[in-house]
Amino acid sequence: EIAQCLVGSEMCIRDRLGGAYFIRAYRYYMKTLQYGDVPLVLDELTEPKVDYYTTTKESIWLKMIKDLEFAAQHVPEANKVKGGQVTKAACKHLLAKYYLLEGRFDDAIRITTEIINGGVHKLCTERFGSNKSAADKDVIWDMFRIENKSLPENTEGLLLTIDRYGMEGNTSGTQVMYNALPYYGLTGVIKTPNGANGMSDAAKNEIGIVEKYGRGISRIRPTWYAQKGVWTIDHVEDFSDYRHRTDNENWMTMEMLVYNNPALKKSGNEWYGKHLQLYSDQGTILCKDTIRCWYGWPNYKTWYPDPDRVQPKGGPGDFYIFRLAETYLLRAEAYVWKGEWQKAAEDINTIRKRANAQYMYSAADVEKQKIGAVLDERARELYYEEPRKVELTRIAIIYARTGIPCYNGKTYTLDRLTEDNFWYDRVVEISDFYNKGVQTPYGNYFTCSPFHIFWPIPSYAINANSGGIINQNKGYPGTEKNIPPLVYEGD
């Protein structure tokens, strides 16, 4: 694209270069927080390369910060680019995450405030788009209709992927429902109280559940925390919060579904068309696999029309990468690291007010919960949007680099990052499964260790790199071949 700029058009060149810097910085943000130290590639490759060496993640971050500072200066605002293109706000948003990694909390506050007060982006608080006249819906529902995400009146999106039906390059759609919904149609798993097979996800049933909500096989299963815990404050579950609202099916529970197996009607079973129950009146559990087949989900986010499938899995649709709501929560996080509890509470509450949440955080709440208050609101607002593992790893590294005490009473250090870290402690604290003796129906146990903060470097990448050495992460086989990683020292 740079070559297509007019000769002498310095502004055009800087715009395109800034966009490229953003894309690279985004990829390295993800890779370094998934894998840790990785090879650094700064030049275009035109032929096979087999002599990579691992570079420290810390030196990669410094390079990405420099690039993003350039990008934030030169990339245009969202109202001056086409949908899907990199925006100035997206560059600043990602830069804020890098600033947080570096402990540059004041810079993170400054750059997020520039986005929030910049006049281009604001939270969507009024009804808009294709369903705005539907009385039973709300602004949260509007924001996540695929046809509404890229509308000019949707001022919240900082960066989106554009995925439309029939668009060149479009493949199999998002498949969001397929991945995120419970496997309610698995044969013989969900029983009626009188012991019959209760559910079907076949197309064209008289009670067409699959057409209305989609077909899921539960590749991504929420914890109790995500379904219930995070929505319950002072022992009250907040169903008035638009993000957890059940009366208009923004949020779905299994009990809202009904037994729809056609065989029930054919046999005259009294339970046909009645609401699902997890337990019989005698206390017998009626679902053989509650891990994959029984949980709640945010229907307002997971429903993607799928015109090519009779059992909808999730068709094409625009998808948020960054939203202004997360920008507020990044600023709230920076305030938490600085101990400015009231300002953090105000930013969290801005998001909660828009969602019609009943409880508002006080400064004392945030001081007590610390980063937990931000993580809870991220879980509510950014369900199925944020890369949760990546963000938890980022926060774990901040704890280890700064030594700031955690809400759990612990402090962490970099030299023991793969042995003792916040990522592991938070996952084990919140999860229903890991290291708690929970077993799948197939006999597998859910286990987790601190070194899983970083994923293993794939053996095929290491083995194919015959002219160099790519290090393996601690805890995985092959670390005996590691050498000290490179430190990128600048251009």
List each language-model region with its residue ranges.
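C-terminal substrate/ligand-recognition segments
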Residues: 215-352
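Long, intrinsically disordered, low-complexity segments
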Residues: 63, 101, 132-203, 299, ...
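An aromatic- and glycine-enriched ligand-binding surface/loop that stacks and positions planar moieties
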Residues: 99-271
